[in-house]
Amino acid sequence: MPTPADDLVVIGKIVSVYGIRGEVKVYSFTDPLDNLLDYRRWTLRRDGETRQAELVRGRLHGKVLAAKLKGLDDREEARTFTGYEICIPRSELPSLEEGEYYWYQLEGLKVIDQGGQLLGVIDHLLETGANDVMVVKPCAGSLDDRERLLPYTGQCVLSIDLAAGEMRVDWDADF
């Protein structure tokens, strides 16, 4: 039985075909990249459409994955899978240590500085070489209408309260 859409988390995206035997090229959002291959049953989602897929095999190929899906044996048919997000139920994600969070848990949190000013909400995160970066967008009640990029580091992030939907940060509002 398919998992409800609000209980799914995106772990990758099919970006193109790979080879001539119906394999697809996948950009993985997992760390390490090939952890995505641990999940055999995928819910694929694109433009409001969902479909189920089963991973037969896959391998790391540079910074992407090459994946073979059950029943997908033709390059042209594989091309129709381009653009699908790869989702799994949240319940299948491994448990994290205290103080560790999945990105999806941080998205939507209100970001509040030390002075109690609402800077905005976390729209999404970016992976950079040095550290992850939170993209904080303005929202109702925020200090101004500026988008901010804040490092996801122990120096910047003071506390996270998922139940309250808040993150406290040490960040100058003028930045």
Swiss-Prot record:
One example of a Gene Ontology biological process annotation: rRNA processing
Q: Which GO terms describe its cellular component?
A: cytoplasm; ribosome
Give the Gene3D superfamilies listed for this entry: PRC-barrel domain, RimM
Name the InterPro entries on file: PRC_barrel-like_sf, PRC_RimM, RimM, RimM_N, RimM_N_sf, Transl_B-barrel_sf
| Disulphide bridges | none
The Swiss-Prot or TrEMBL record describes its family as follows: Belongs to the RimM family.
Please state what the protein is called: Ribosome maturation factor RimM
Q: Which organism is it from?
A: Pseudomonas paraeruginosa (strain DSM 24068 / PA7)
